[in-house]
């Protein structure tokens, strides 16, 4: 099958940008079109096969004709409308941002970042952090040829689970700050299941920023560590951290935005596991693009949790021609997140995230009065277990009612740890290959509220394609004249 014909876009370029493009052509030996379109395709996550033609100096004309995939042209047009500017200006800005400063991928690999490890920092040493740290230890010797529950691949794009190395951690409670990460993960109020011993990591938990990270009820059972907030940016730089995971409590809106600023200043990638919307927001997408670093977000999915199960059931109704009339999902748990969510104003973004994730699989709009998805109550004896009750009421052939109910019981934090292990390795692949901004495919597969919602099968295919196109080691063949 022939590839779709490329579309032509005539771009008016300032002299300084043409000079930068000429320098890149000389440096890489690639054609001007391959350089420029390659940058645009990388920025907007569109597949692009370079021509391999040798580079030529750009001509004296003030305009350059770019030949690009139709999908890229469509994405540029859509983003231009979104940002209220024309396509020409968007192309010039994107190329200038990338060529006007040293790309992060170059500094990642050559100056301060290690290509052989995925260096990870954690914000919030709670149950999820505990399960993640245990999981990396538990699967460090896993056979890449064997199936491991909860992981896309033991070896993902050239990175094994054991290639994940923890470099820094931040928390605000006296029980955790100042302790080795391997000890802090067992401290109060953490109460998730233990499935692996963890040796000393050599990573001391630093005093982080509180802001709105501790809610009213959680503040009654933990004590804030004394002292000033440690130098987050300096620590991330000194430890050569690649990726920062946001594990702050639900409702930490201001704290998440503050940490996001520190992550950008440090030049790190981000995996936003919380339902504070960063990756899906245009403003933050642009900030990560400008910084030259990737982000996966927002709000981590579980391996098999209440929301993914709810999505599948709603999809079955859709695919089998049953009209979904109303539905609910009620969640109960005994961890600190459920305690935090006793404050109803802290769970607004969580409720929006879970609701949108379910509604996105339907081809029609379900009124807000007919869908309720969200945390319901805190039950201390459940500890880190979560119970979810799901009900769907629909109309089938002959306008006959069809109803379905399901109960699911999980250990909440281990249920998402494998997903995060995949997420940090995917962001590392993006860093290595100079891909910046929100990673659309991986975010859709791994997160409840991504920038773009795809159905689960399509999202996985996009993520697998991302891995194939951005492996750890790439050998570039010499272009033939």
Question: What does each of the following model-derived ranges do?
Answer:
Residues 123, 162-165, 176, 187-190, ...:
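Active-site-lining helix/loop region of Rossmann-like oxidoreductase modules
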Residues 1-13, 46-68, 77:
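Short Lys/Arg-rich basic patches
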Residues 14-34, 70-89, 93:
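Surface-exposed, Lys/Arg-rich phosphate-binding patches that contact polyanionic backbones
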Residues 30-52, 85-107:
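Short, basic amphipathic alpha-helical segments that act as recognition/interaction helices
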Residues 106-259, 347-352, 388, 397:
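N-terminal glycine-/serine-/threonine-rich beta1-alpha1-beta2 phosphate-ribose binding loop
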Residues 250-262, 273-294:
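Rossmann-fold NAD(P)-binding glycine/threonine-rich loop
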Residues 418-481:
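NAD(P)-dependent Rossmann-like dehydrogenase/reductase catalytic/cofactor-binding core
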Residues 287-300, 321, 325:
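Rossmann-fold dehydrogenase core element
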């Amino acid at each position: 099958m022939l590839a779709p014909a490329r579309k032509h876009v005539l771009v008016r370029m300032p002299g300084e940008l043409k000079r930068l493009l000429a320098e890149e052509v000389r440096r890489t030996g690639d054609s001007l079109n391959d350089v420029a379109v390659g940058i645009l395709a990388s920025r907007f996550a569109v597949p692009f096969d370079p021509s391999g033609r040798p580079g030529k100096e750009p001509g004296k004309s003030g305009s350059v004709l770019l030949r690009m995939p139709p999908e890229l042209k469509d994405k540029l047009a859509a983003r231009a409308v979104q940002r209220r500017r024309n396509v020409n200006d968007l192309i010039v800005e994107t190329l200038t941002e990338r060529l006007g400063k040293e790309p992060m991928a170059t500094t990642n690999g050559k100056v301060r970042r290690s290509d052989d490890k995925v260096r990870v920092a954690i914000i919030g040493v709670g149950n999820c952090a505990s399960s993640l740290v245990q999981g990396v230890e538990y699967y460090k010797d896993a056979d890449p040829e064997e199936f491991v529950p909860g992981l896309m691949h033991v070896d993902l794009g050239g990175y094994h689970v054991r290639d994940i190395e923890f470099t820094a951690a931040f928390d605000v409670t006296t029980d955790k700050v100042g302790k080795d990460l391997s000890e802090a993960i067992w401290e109060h109020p953490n109460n998730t299941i233990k499935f692996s011993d963890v040796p000393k990591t050599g990573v001391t938990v630093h005093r982080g920023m509180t802001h709105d990270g501790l809610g009213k009820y959680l503040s009654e059972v933990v004590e804030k560590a004394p002292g000033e907030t440690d130098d987050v940016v300096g620590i991330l730089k000194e430890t050569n951290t690649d990726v920062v995971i946001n594990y702050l409590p639900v409702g930490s809106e201001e704290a998440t935005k503050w940490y996001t600023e520190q992550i950008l200043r440090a030049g790190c990638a981000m995996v936003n596991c919380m339902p504070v919307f960063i990756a899906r927001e245009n403003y933050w997408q642009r900030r990560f693009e400008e910084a030259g670093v990737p982000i996966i977000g927002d709000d981590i999915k579980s391996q098999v949790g209440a929301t993914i199960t709810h999505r599948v059931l709603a999809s079955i109704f859709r695919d089998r021609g049953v009209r979904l009339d109303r539905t609910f999902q009620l969640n109960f748990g005994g961890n600190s997140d459920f305690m935090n969510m006793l404050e109803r104003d802290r769970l607004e973004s969580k409720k929006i995230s879970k609701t949108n994730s379910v509604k996105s699989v339907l081809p029609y709009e379900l009124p807000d009065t007919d869908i309720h998805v969200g945390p319901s109550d805190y039950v201390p004896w459940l500890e880190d277990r979560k119970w979810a009750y799901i009900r769907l009421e629909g109309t089938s052939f002959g306008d006959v009612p069809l109803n379905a109910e399901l109960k699911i019981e999980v250990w909440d934090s281990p249920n998402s740890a494998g997903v995060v292990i995949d997420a940090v390795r995917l962001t590392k692949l993006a860093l290595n290959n100079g891909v910046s901004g929100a990673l659309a495919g991986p975010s859709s597969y791994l997160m409840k509220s991504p920038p773009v919602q795809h159905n689960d099968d399509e999202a996985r295919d996009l993520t697998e394609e991302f891995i194939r196109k951005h492996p750890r080691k790439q050998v570039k063949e010499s272009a033939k004249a």
